[in-house]
Amino acid sequence: IRDRDNAILACHPISGNANVEEWWTPLFGPGHVLDTSKYFIVCCNAIGSPYGTLSPLTRKGGEDVSGGTWKCSPHVHAPDEQTEQLWWGPDLPKTTIRDDVRLQKHVLDFLGVEQLACVMGGSIGGATSLEWPLCFPVRFPSSPDALVTMTPEQKPYVRSIVVLAASARHSAWCIAWCEIQRQAIEADTRYQHGRYLLRDPPSGGLAAARMCALMTYRQPHSFERRFSRLRGKSNMTSAPKDSQASTLMEEGGDGDFEEDVAKIREPQAQEQYAVQSYLHHHGAKFLTRFDALCYIHLSDKLDSHDVTRDRASWSQDTSSESAMLKGVLRHLGNAPNSPRVLVLSVTSDMLYTPAEQKAIHDAVPASKLVHIESSEGHDGFLIEYPQIDRAIREFMERLNVSHNPSAL
């Protein structure tokens, strides 16, 4: 870790995992943002993710996920099975993004990281990035929720953050979409109040929830441009044999979007519209790598996101939500040694709108706002790699955020 201050913490999207090189591949390598010859890259699975750390699939007192294959072991939640009592299942307490931040801090302490060069992420990962310097302005704050007024001689724990396609709080619009997805899962008769057998999960509900989510990750123009009213292959509803290869390229799990459309255009079965085939294909594809309870846990976590929660005392003006937001976020830029903040906004994002990124930028003194031009909606944060790579590299180069901290 060199001088123990060249670490970059990457925070994954909701359906991602700790293998950041898998879902942000174009940002890796010499000359790119995640250059391992310069930086020590760290990524931790969020609590609730089925890929590790802690989730409804976790044994009470142990772990049930194979990090080598990223596949969940076929254990049970159901009370009629003797082994059920060993697994958290629906009994796992709800967690927040701040819980993830605190757990990640323990990992970084274990690794010996004394200062983070940057925390970056998109979507829920961007929300995590925003929480990081609020939770840990210094390495060891007096209490987890303490407001630390930085003095010039203090060393910030986080030197910079990149907030990509995220908001400072989960909006009513986003909460509503998450609730629709949860209801789709819970309406499946196999759900059994969360005490289902993993060999007989609520597949229909989870697939429907994923299809609903896909609609929020894109926007109407991109669907019309690709599908229009074309008819497509009915066998697109089945998951491909190698469904792990490209599932994490985009938040929507459809890194092979153009390839899928090309397949749909083949003059074969005409039973479905192409867009129906596309949605069913990716709904089924999601079932091979995710668990319904994990999905519900993570969506609940998203809903809890609000940087002003339990921080009313941080703001001098509590007359409105926007005033409180500004009052809390101003602490990210009110001192010479405050973390530098880059906010990236996808111009066509209908989930976390550009107005929400502008609100962050307006509230944080000396922050920088960059618009990522894209017609792909929210998924643009995992598609428009050249723009994103360039914006972050220029940001870090200007600040000289590297293994040499003397520039700051």
Indicate where each model-derived feature is located.
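Gly/Pro-rich cap/lid or specificity-loop segments adjacent to the active site
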Residues: R2, S15-A127, L134, V138-A168, ...
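Active-site nucleophile elbow and catalytic-triad environment of alpha/beta-hydrolase enzymes
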Residues: Y278-H282, I296-L332
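Short beta-strand element of the alpha/beta-hydrolase
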Residues: D5-S15
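Alpha/beta-hydrolase-fold enzymes
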Residues: L147-K285
